[in-house]
From Swiss-Prot:
Enzyme class: transferase
Active site location: K10, D136
BP terms from Gene Ontology: isopentenyl diphosphate biosynthetic process, methylerythritol 4-phosphate pathway; terpenoid biosynthetic process
Protein's recorded name: 4-diphosphocytidyl-2-C-methyl-D-erythritol kinase
Pathway: Isoprenoid biosynthesis; isopentenyl diphosphate biosynthesis via DXP pathway; isopentenyl diphosphate from 1-deoxy-D-xylulose 5-phosphate: step 3/6
Family as reported in the entry's similarity comment: Belongs to the GHMP kinase family. IspE subfamily.
Enzyme Commission identifier(s): 2.7.1.148
């Protein structure tokens, strides 16, 4: 059996860290949504008991360091799977960008393996299992728009956001998420209004969504990396209704109602930033998963 499955990137419409927990993680409230910048995974069931990864991108490990490999290994051990798998990853999501590319790939792998290994697990069960690998993966298992709490693994579904344009810009720097959280001072930062964001999404109010965007991690990343702030400022100067850093960065995204204005923001960033994308909110469709027996 062979299967192909889409792994969409995500952005944080709001990201709040409330306090540091005893386990070392921060208690978070994040409203996230998937976008149509996506990787594609191709899974082939093998009779031989082995996991083979083939990543069509440089600098991405194909062994136990990869979240996809960890996801496959976890399912094999948990359910005593004797079959193997070959997984080919066609990468489009930038690496180490704050867009959950690795987490989304792992989520897609879990869903694909559930099919080709005939495990019969529900989405809820897959999401629960995924939290053993990484905090963002549970959201990626569900996709769409959702509130994530706890350390990011507790997911409450929300309606999809109204149609708009999203311009992404990733500078050629890397950011350490653990370092950003370590330097975050939760008592000395402006916190986003998560409830306002949720209400705006439920009401289909784009202007309310734009106004409620916020990310406490900007207080650290923008201070340490001025080029990230310059990208955000440039987006707003070219007409973005809202601009925000995704995750711990370094990617910044602009939210825009009209195509013509989005194109102006996109063109204003090309040449200024190495990687620029113009995308839409993700809508699940019939081509998300294809199965060949």
């Amino acid at each position: 059996m062979k299967i192909s499955i889409t792994a969409p990137a995500k952005i944080n419409l709001s990201l709040d860290a409330l306090y540091k927990r005893e386990d070392g993680y921060h208690e978070v409230e994040m409203v996230m949504t998937t976008i149509d910048l996506a990787d594609r995974l191709y899974l082939e069931r093998l009779d031989e008991d082995k996991i083979v990864l083939d990543v069509k991108a440089h600098f991405i490990p194909e062994d136990r360091r990869n979240l996809i490999y960890q996801a496959a290994l976890l399912l094999k051990k948990r359910f005593d799977v004797k079959m193997g798998v070959r997984i080919t990853i066609d990468k489009h999501i930038p690496v180490s960008a704050g867009l959950a590319g690795g987490s989304s790939d792992a989520a897609a792998a879990l869903k694909g393996l559930n099919v080709i290994w005939e495990l019969g697990l529900s989405i809820e069960e897959l999401a629960e299992i995924s939290s053993e690998i990484g905090s963002d993966i549970a959201f990626c298992v569900y996709g769409g728009t959702a509130l994530a709490t706890g350390r990011g693994e507790k997911i409450s579904a929300l309606p999809n956001i109204p149609g708009c344009w999203i311009v992404l810009a990733k500078p050629s720097i890397s950011v350490s998420t653990p370092t950003i959280y370590k330097e975050l001072q939760v008592d000395n930062v402006e916190h986003p209004d998560t409830q306002k964001m949720i209400e705006s999404i439920k009401n289909g109010d784009l202007d309310g969504i734009f106004a409620a965007t916020g990310n406490v991690l900007e207080s650290v990343t923008l201070e340490k990396n001025p080029q990230v702030k310059r990208i955000k400022d440039r987006m707003l100067a070219f007409g973005a209704e809202a601009a925000l850093m995704s995750g711990s960065g370094p990617t910044v995204f602009a939210l825009i109602k009209q195509y013509s204005r989005a194109k102006r923001v996109y063109n204003g960033l090309r040449g200024f930033c190495e990687e620029v994308y113009m995308v839409r909110p993700w809508s699940e469709g019939e081509n998300d998963t294809n199965i060949n027996y």
